[in-house]
Amino acid sequence: MAPSATLPLTTAILAIGRLVAAQQPGTSTPEVHPKLTTYKCTTSGGCVAQDTSVVLDWNYRWMHDANYNSCTVNGGVNTTLCPDEATCGKNCYIEGVDYAASGVTASGSTLTLNQYMPSSSGGYSSVSPRLYLLGPDGEYVMLKLNGQELSFDVDLSALPCGENGSLYLSQMDENGGANQYNTAGANYGSGYCDAQCPVQTWRNGTLNTSGQGFCCNEMDILEGNSRANALTPHSCTATACDSAGCGFNPYGSGYPNYFGPGDTVDTSKTFTIITQFNTDNGSPSGNLVSITRKYRQNGVDIPSAKPGGDTISSCPSASAYGGLATMGKALSSGMVLVFSIWNDNSQYMNWLDSGRAGPCSSTEGNPSNILANNPGTHVVYSNIRWGDIGSTTNSTGGNPPPPPPPASSTTFSTTRRSSTTSSSPSCTQTHWGQCGGIGYTGCKTCTSGTTCQYGNDYYSQCL
């Protein structure tokens, strides 16, 4: 997962033809979604290319009134412009984004995300993008993976200790929570939720006047870097979640030489991750009973870390939330595919790659170290495909995707970073909050570990 954020962006949801005056698209820069080809596969027909793209999260975007006064201040909203949902929807325009400047590039079936980008004032700014898979209709692609599998190629070689390249599923609404006050919806990255129950200014596309967190089922397919990785389901009820989850981490499960540069899964090179959601009757209509992780590299299947297979078949911490059965229902109804890259100013990502979890030292993941030594850190996802179990890596039948470049259960509980919350009443701006810009009157001092980074004349942000 990735934390909530806020960046200046722009417009162009007009093509879906259902806009009214409510969190209206702005006019500064068109919202042009980067095309990302993905593949849907069957055992009988092979893999068929899908017309898909990616969209940057709503919370990264600049929102303003007709006079370019910011609709957000001090991590919340400008109560003059946004005293209630209806008035805010009428007054505020949400802008699109320059995807390249936000660290995002896509070509064919390949998506590259950068943690840092050169700053106009010199040095680098942390951009930490989070994106969602979008269909040609301007709504999120809903992946229904119960009794199915998801495969993708990934290059983690440029992610050092402390970085997290994440690819996961979130049970967001297909339309991004679009409603009468927010017609931008999924086309502008609205409606994010996860098992950390983040508290955001907008909750499922609507002004969050109550300050509630937004919880939903989350399936972390990959959280990792070149030194460690975890596969973790997070089941939820309507108001609470198994935020820690029961993950499978090879290092944390007693296999320290399985995943890393030069190891069994050699992270100095591109490899394929296959995640299978197994049901009791072997079909999408069954109950989810286990989740299995597999790897391929250079076209060869890699043996599992654990002799009985790298499988999660139970999750004690999730029992209060329905366990794997709850996750299976979410996978059956459809979940949104999320891509992100981020690092961690508070815990240095120790829960992922240090101590019991990995070989990194407790301070190696400090973002200041990453920036000093690896300003070009990035992750590359490619050849994303989903469908019948066994179909996504089968080279026979239909039109397969391009080849990748040249049972016992073990679970590993992690302590996750805290979720994004409302800003402090003191005049110190939170991480990701606005800290400057023409007409901005809120707090300009950023919380410890972040600095105020210029985005444009109307928007600067604590990063």
Swiss-Prot record:
- Which positions are catalytic residues? 218 (nucleophile), 223 (proton donor)
GO biological-process terms attached to the record: cellulose catabolic process
Question: What is the scientific name of the source organism?
Answer: Trichoderma longibrachiatum
Signal sequence: where?
1-22
Q: What does this protein do?
A: The biological conversion of cellulose to glucose generally requires three types of hydrolytic enzymes: (1) Endoglucanases which cut internal beta-1,4-glucosidic bonds; (2) Exocellobiohydrolases that cut the disaccharide cellobiose from the non-reducing end of the cellulose polymer chain; (3) Beta-1,4-glucosidases which hydrolyze the cellobiose and other short cello-oligosaccharides to glucose.
| Low complexity bias locations | 408-429
Q: Residue ranges of region Catalytic?
A: 23-397
Q: Which reaction does it catalyse?
A: Endohydrolysis of (1->4)-beta-D-glucosidic linkages in cellulose, lichenin and cereal beta-D-glucans
Q: Which family does it belong to?
A: Belongs to the glycosyl hydrolase 7 (cellulase C) family.
Q: Where is this region: Disordered?
A: 390-429
Name of the gene: egl1
Cellular location of this protein? Secreted
The UniProt keywords, alphabetically, are: Carbohydrate metabolism, Cellulose degradation, Disulfide bond, Glycoprotein, Glycosidase, Hydrolase, Polysaccharide degradation, Secreted, Signal
Region Linker: start-end pairs = 402-427
Q: What is the protein name given in its UniProt record?
A: Endoglucanase EG-1
